[in-house]
């Protein structure tokens, strides 16, 4: 498991989309792998935007920030 920043450093993601890409975040919650999606403004700003979205998502859902399993660009 990792944070969004760690996932980007490890390149636990794939992306061919360049305009407003959508990323699927897989994460651990109560021993289950769950998924959510976020759309960012550009691939070049994806890491920072995803980090902000993820922080808010974790706060709203009572999750640990380092529960990320994978980050995949899905469109």
Where in the sequence are the language-model features?
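Short N-terminal "domain-start" leader segments
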Residues: 1-22
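Short stretches within intrinsically disordered, low-complexity N-terminal or propeptide regions
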Residues: 4, 9, 44-48, 72
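Short glycine-rich, low-complexity/disordered patches
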Residues: 22, 57-75
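Hydrophobic beta-strand residues in large extracellular and virion-surface proteins
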Residues: 23-27, 38-40, 50, 68-71
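Short, flexible beta-strand-to-coil junctions
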Residues: 26-32, 74-75
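A short, exposed loop/beta-hairpin motif centered on an aromatic-Gly-Thr core
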Residues: 32-46
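A short, charged, amphipathic alpha-helix used as a generic interaction element across diverse proteins
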Residues: 43-65
């Amino acid at each position: 498991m990792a944070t969004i920043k760690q996932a980007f450093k490890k390149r636990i993601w794939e992306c061919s989309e360049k305009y407003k890409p959508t990323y699927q975040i897989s994460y651990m919650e109560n021993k289950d792998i769950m998924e959510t999606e976020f759309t960012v403004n550009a691939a070049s700003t994806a890491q920072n935007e995803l980090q902000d979205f993820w922080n808010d998502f974790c706060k709203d859902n009572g999750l640990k920030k380092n529960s990320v399993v994978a980050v995949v660009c899905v469109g």
